[in-house]
């Protein structure tokens, strides 16, 4: 069985200062066997991490569509933000990616989904995120869990970590998998190991965003 972190960010995200190397070291220390790196609208950090630890790292992306965010694993090519969700999903299907929906009911997040828009895409995606450790209220996770049960769709859980101490806060234990198809099969046997993060973690993201805007201590290879 594998312990999986399905939702995390690196310094390549606009609101994280977590170096790729530190993320990988923390995953090893915490016994995280697979990590899906889902930077905001970018894949450079995930590809760099996979070069360093190809067995542990799965390339992902958190993509902002015109309606809400999608959380994707086994990405081959970056999808830019700002496209309609149906267009993004079609492009991801061409890549044989696994598609989940980020924190769909967390109305405190910019990337949450209106119910009508979520209903439209549910038949076209593989899962929705039924537990996100950074949700401002656990009721948003409960709404996602109830919705997934009603629709008979798989659920993913993730820490949404933007800092090293958050990694593994919400993880999944799964049988071996190696691509989107085997991940779908494995999720039918998922065991969730989850706990909520303090709302204070969001200040780490705001601090990272501010640092990048003014360019303090940010490596030259990272765009603001």
Task: Describe each model-derived feature in a short phrase.
Residues 90-97:
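Short, charged N-terminal beta->alpha structural module
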Residues 102-106:
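Acidic/Gly/His-enriched mid-domain segments of enzyme catalytic cores or analogous surface patches
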Residues 25-41, 97-100:
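Divalent metal-dependent hydrolysis catalytic cores, especially in the metallo-beta-lactamase
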Residues 1-25, 44-48, 52-59, 65-81, ...:
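Charged catalytic cores and adjacent phosphate/nucleic-acid-binding surfaces used
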């Amino acid at each position: 069985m594998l312990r999986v972190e399905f939702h995390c960010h690196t310094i390549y995200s606009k609101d994280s200062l977590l170096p790729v190397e530190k993320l990988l070291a923390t995953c090893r220390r915490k016994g995280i066997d697979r990590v899906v790196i889902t930077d905001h609208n970018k894949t450079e950090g995930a590809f760099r991490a996979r070069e360093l630890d190809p067995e542990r790292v799965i390339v992902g992306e958190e993509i902002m569509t015109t309606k809400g965010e999608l959380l994707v694993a086994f990405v081959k090519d970056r999808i830019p933000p700002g496209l309609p969700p149906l267009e993004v999903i079609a492009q991801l299907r061409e890549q044989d990616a696994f598609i989940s929906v980020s924190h769909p009911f967390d109305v405190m997040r910019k990337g949450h989904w209106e119910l009508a828009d979520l209903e439209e895409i549910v038949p076209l995606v593989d899962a929705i995120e039924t537990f996100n450790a950074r949700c401002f209220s656990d009721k948003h996770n409960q709404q996602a869990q109830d919705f997934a049960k009603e629709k008979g769709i798989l659920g993913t859980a993730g820490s949404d970590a933007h800092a090293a101490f958050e990694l593994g806060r919400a993880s999944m234990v799964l049988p071996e998998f190696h691509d989107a198809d085997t991940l779908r099969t494995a999720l039918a046997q998922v065991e969730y190991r989850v706990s909520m993060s303090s709302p204070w973690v969001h200040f780490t993201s705001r601090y990272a965003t501010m640092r990048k805007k003014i360019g303090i201590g940010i490596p030259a290879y990272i765009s603001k």
